[in-house]
């Protein structure tokens, strides 16, 4: 996907520090934007965020007010609903009641603190999407996403209104395993149309 986007623009890729509250992810993303602007003043800027990174991108776009576009890849519309859906009922209840959860994932042993959930409460993603308008937004999702239900993409597009371009791929999972090339080509075309006037 980054290679396809790179046909039209310079691409900066980074990973958020793991298991952080979303407010910290927003801080990291804003720091990256500041560095890009320092190095390339006047450059057109588009944010692409996947899953929770898409939510951080929504928040950042609303706060920034000077971006040129937003791409939401398998992005939630309601953060608490998303985690209530993917966690067991017991895990969610324990975390929501103030208990720290310990687990292992691809990064090794991790701890999920209660403020991971409570931090969500200050962010109304549909309202933030509306605040970011008239920013053009490409919304990409798979209909069989097992983590972020496709209806959340539809709600994101509805909140955006006419500035949204929604594409839901039939079947497919949260990682776009079957559709990464197709989605990447669509993304590249969308970017290309918006960068015809020139960019970094």
Residue spans for each PLM region:
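Short amphipathic alpha-helix adjacent to the substrate-entry channel of hydrolases
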Residues: 1-12
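Alpha/beta-hydrolase fold nucleophile elbow
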Residues: 40-51
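Hydrolase active-site cap/lid region
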Residues: 63-114
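Short beta-strand/loop motif that positions the catalytic acidic residue
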Residues: 132-133, 139-141, 145
């Amino acid at each position: 996907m980054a290679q396809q986007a790179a046909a039209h623009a310079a691409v900066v890729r980074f990973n958020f520090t793991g298991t952080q509250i979303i407010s910290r992810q927003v801080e990291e993303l804003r720091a990256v934007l500041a560095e890009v602007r320092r190095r390339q003043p006047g450059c057109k800027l588009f944010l692409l965020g996947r899953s929770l990174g898409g939510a951080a991108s929504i928040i950042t776009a609303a706060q920034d007010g000077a971006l040129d576009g937003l791409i939401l890849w398998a992005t939630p519309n309601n953060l608490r609903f998303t985690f209530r859906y993917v966690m067991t009922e017991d895990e969610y209840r324990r975390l929501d009641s103030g208990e720290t959860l310990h687990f292992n994932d691809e990064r090794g042993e991790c701890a999920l603190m209660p403020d991971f959930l409570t931090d969500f409460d200050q962010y109304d993603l549909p309202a933030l999407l509306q605040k970011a308008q008239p920013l053009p937004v490409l919304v990409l999702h798979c209909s069989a996403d097992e983590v972020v239900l496709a209806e959340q993409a539809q709600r994101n597009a509805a909140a955006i209104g006419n500035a949204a371009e929604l594409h839901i791929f039939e079947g497919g999972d949260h990682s776009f395993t079957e559709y990464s090339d197709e989605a990447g080509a669509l993304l590249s075309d969308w970017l290309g149309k918006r960068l015809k006037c020139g960019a970094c």
